[in-house]
């Protein structure tokens, strides 16, 4: 079975990070939350992660242009996977896809039905 749709139960600091990184790697991701208030707390975390990822890509892009050694964040891939502006563009596209492919939901039943894999990241 090929996993395509991942559900992360919980959108706190850890859940948001798991969800964004999973979406960055190309999966469709839904974050299941318990309340409207949780949505309001999760959205800024996701926006922050989006901005952090873009800033990291910009840093790598500047190093590439300057001919400096490249140090990619671990979740971005191996340093030798970025050799050109086209590779940088692919990273930017992955961040945009991640943002687009993240969904927030309050409907646990629907999330469970659609999920190929569920990751639990809820407060105890």
Where do the model's predicted regions map?
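Hydrophobic Val/Ile/Leu positions in short beta-strands of Rossmann-like dinucleotide-binding domains
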Residues: 7-8
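Glycine-rich Rossmann-fold phosphate-binding loop(s) that bind the pyrophosphate
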Residues: 11-12
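N-terminal Rossmann-fold NAD(P) dinucleotide-binding loop
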Residues: 15-16
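Aromatic pocket-lining residues of Rossmann-like dinucleotide-binding sites
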Residues: 22
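Short beta-strand element of Class I
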Residues: 29
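Rossmann-like NAD(P)-binding element
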Residues: 34-41, 52-124
């Amino acid at each position: 079975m090929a996993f395509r749709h991942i559900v992360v139960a919980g959108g706190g600091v850890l859940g948001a990070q798991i969800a964004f990184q999973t979406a960055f790697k190309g999966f469709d991701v839904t974050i299941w939350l318990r309340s409207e208030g949780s949505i309001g707390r999760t959205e800024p975390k996701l926006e922050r992660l989006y901005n952090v990822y873009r800033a990291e890509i910009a840093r790598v892009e500047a190093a590439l242009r300057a001919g400096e050694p490249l140090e990619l964040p671990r979740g971005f891939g191996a340093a030798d996977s970025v050799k050109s502006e086209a590779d940088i563009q692919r990273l930017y596209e992955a961040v945009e896809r991640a943002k687009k492919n993240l969904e927030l939901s309050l409907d646990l039943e629907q999330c469970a039905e659609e999920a190929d894999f569920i990751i639990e990241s809820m407060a105890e």
